[in-house]
Amino acid sequence: MTMITDSLAVVLQRRDWENPGVTQLNRLAAHPPFASWRNSEEARTDRPSQQLRSLNGEWRFAWFPAPEAVPESWLECDLPDADTIVVPSNWQMHGYDAPIYTNVTYPITVNPPFVPVENPTGCYSLTFNVDESWLQEGQTRIIFDGVNSAFHLWCNGRWVGYGQDSRLPSEFDLSAFLRAGENRLAVMVLRWSDGSYLEDQDMWRMSGIFRDVSLLHKPTTQISDFHVATRFNDDFSRAVLEAEVQMCGELRDELRVTVSLWQGETQVASGTTPFGGEIIDERGGYADRVTLRLNVENPALWSAEIPNLYRAVVKLHTADGTLIEAEACDVGFREVRIENGLLLLNGKPLLIRGVNRHEHHPLHGQVMDEQTMVQDILLMKQNNFNAVRCSHYPNHPLWYTLCDRYGLYVVDEANIETHGMVPMNRLTDDPRWLPAMSERVTRMVQRDRNHPSVIIWSLGNESGHGANHDALYRWIKSVDPSRPVQYEGGGADTSATDIICPMYARVDEDQPFPAVPKWSIKKWLSLPGELRPLILCEYAHAMGNSLGGFAKYWQAFRQYPRLQGGFVWDWVDQSLIKYDENGNPWSAYGGDFGDTPNDRQFCMNGLVFADRTPHPALTEAKHQQQFFQFRLSGRTIEVTSEYLFRHSDNELLHWTVALDGKPLASGEVPLDVAPQGKQVIELPVLPQPESTGQLWLTVHVVQPNATAWSEAGHISAWHQWRLAENLSVTLPAASHSIPHLTTSEMDFCIELGNKRWQFNRQSGFLSQMWIGDEKQLLTPLRAQFTRAPLDNDIGVSEATRIDPNAWVERWKAAGHYQAEAALLQCTADTLADAVLITTAHAWQHQGKTLFISRKTYRIDGSGQMAITVDVEVASDTPHPARIGLTCQLAQVAERVNWLGLGPQENYPDRLTAACFDRWDLPLSDMYTPYVFPSENGLRCGTRELNYGPHQWRGDFQFNISRYSQQQLMETSHRHLLHAEEGTWLNIDGFHMGIGGDDSWSPSVSAEFQLSAGRYHYQLVWCQK
């Protein structure tokens, strides 16, 4: 044990937090989570241990601007002005200091290993009681599961130790410091340390004791470590559980270790042995270690599909059977290996349906509770995810147990990121920083290696490629050869990775960056000598209204076996709750706490909002990742299962044939599909509709019974086909009425019964409509070529740093947002049964014509207004965001009804999950409440739209809400939006894709850009 004077002044003088060679003082060695059961049955059933005591709850707390400001007296007693704070928590979430959101830029001046003199410091203290029995025998430990970023610990006024690495436990022996009865802990937490230079992750920078604190009482002679691994024969019919156990304390001849393996209530295997390990070299072996091997016939294999678990109980006892203590862990029999360029689990090539997940809670910051963790896992499973990357640090210990039990593949990632360094490998190639990096990698492996869900180790994130990475790669491969290692830094295909694991590489487009090119994922596989699998560690940047082009990735994954999937960036928006002056909560992002530097809303890249409400894009991910694929030939549906291990035993296939959303026939067939098998379903002869319309066959795979992660009735997969329809023509009903045209100097006015249409001759716009005496429009019907910018449109542009390549900057520079209409033509003609208004406009900016829009409005005797639009786009202007029409309707109706793709928001490059049907939703549901307001709520493939007294028919896209594009564009946060008068309607003949390969460069694929020079569309507007 390192001995240091208890004086605070001496501790401060040492400045351990500015010494990369000091990562801990007196911290105990890493190991899997312990409970020290004194009853083996409690260990088997994972009941709470009487030897493990939580110290979570209210602690005393005082905040200081720097450690030097902490008074020496605090070591002995609480300060008069100390407050209370909940542990675990981030102190910034309790009004102390401010959270800082930054992506790449370090939040402190870069001068490693030194940190600012103004180094916010939190002083925690807790008074607790210890029973005399804990002091008479054994060892009492204190475990801090997570403290950011470094801390010193005192007990009863005496210095105990020091720890850093905010995402792994720091554990200390308190035995020599405790007394029977009342004891006092004092923990001094520093916001910044030299470890902060290794923790430059894209997240909020927060501080404090943010994970659990507990006391653990172990016997004097104790289990100090244990590790389980599974080995198999070629066909997985026989397995061996290999358990390595290490003890410490008095090594006596009478000591024995028993490892028993349980499957539920049944003991499958057991073995007992005295201590004395295998011979290592000519000097012998380890006297305090032992390896046991238990044979298991026909093991129930673990996978994310079927997470079969056994329970291993490790008992330390005497020869006569007297139990000293027991430890235990869940065991999953599974094998991970790379063979012939494929990542295999239990001999089958995996397809990673993955997502990156930060530990984030909108109210609690980086504090994770079990309820939130389970909620995340259930949502992931329900949306066809099978893997999660712990980005970018080891997670709360409970997370891995839950992934074991519910079934998720885990990439466990070391808490190392130096993204803000120049060059990025400045520290990771420096041997002075190897001890700090080594602690972060080795301790992660030692803590988590018993978890079957952990199938890949990661050396960290965005830290370049240095010699330290190569050393740590070799260490992992020597200690745990059962798992591959991945690391993206330095180009994603260095010597430090078993898997090509790029981030944001595109399907077909090379990005030839200097030193670290990102090849297209298809090309990467064919590079000379490249035989590794490719799994994208990050792709599909889900920032705001995004995930366009996601289907292209999944087409490639299914086409090329060595393209084995990837991890979407990312799971949850990292917004935080703030309160306005009236106590109303609102969602905040970078800069909202006065934090500098900050990267604004770049913290919100989630498939779900911070409160776990899904983004519409989550449905697209679910659909593309679904485990059943479908093919239609005539009346035959072929269902293919992509499950590797699971036989469909809880699935029904529902099919429906509908004409314009009206069901004509339906049925239900049980699915009985072997893993990777097929089932052919023959449909009956389908009825032929008598009327015209779109005929669609829709299939849904429904789970009739509840599972551990889904309720009964859960839909896991679906598909639609448009069927051939009989050719027929429905003639409009004859009308004897003829609209009446009145011409004045200012207007053309058309009347028919109780309806009137007014066209302004000076503007050329439809300026008003009446039904009876009620006006229908608050603004004229105008052409529209812009949208409120998406995050993907903005890229890295901001007020102080313009990216001229970003779509929004190109649109602004070209004048798309400022364009004014110059009237070229506005005429009226009376036809035999209708009135025809013809208009033409040149949309100009600073004398330059950007668009020419020609429209005809044909109002017939039935009251229908048929609108025909032709648009010419100037060849030298950027491709527009949309080509459509917009107006502000006077009504506010409760519901919106449409025939088209839905029900969720969808866009041209993100619509594979949308179904064609007749949908009816509240108006409020047509708006997607992205925290950073933008274009939202589009519905594509629309044949009919009904709202209030109005109906629109044609083939168009629309969005409808209380917010104008102008307001969405000018507003920084959703809570600042105000419902405008009436309802804003946008009807588009064409709309550009949204992109999403990344959010900092134009990522809309060419096929989804509006690159043609001419566009034509039609629609009919009438009243019901």
Swiss-Prot record:
Catalytic reaction list: Hydrolysis of terminal non-reducing beta-D-galactose residues in beta-D-galactosides
Binding site for Mg(2+) 2: N598
Keywords: Glycosidase, Hydrolase, Magnesium, Metal-binding, Sodium
Protein name: Beta-galactosidase
EC number(s) from the headed UniProt entry: 3.2.1.23
Binding-site residues, Mg(2+) 1: E417, H419, E462
Pfam families listed in its UniProt record: Bgal_small_N (PF02929), Glyco_hydro_2 (PF00703), Glyco_hydro_2_C (PF02836), Glyco_hydro_2_N (PF02837), LacZ_4 (PF16353)
Cofactor mode of binding and number, as noted: Binds 2 magnesium ions per monomer. Binds 1 sodium ion per monomer.
Residues involved in substrate binding: N103, D202, E462, E538, Y539, A540, H541, N605, W1000
Required cofactor names: Mg(2+); Na(+)
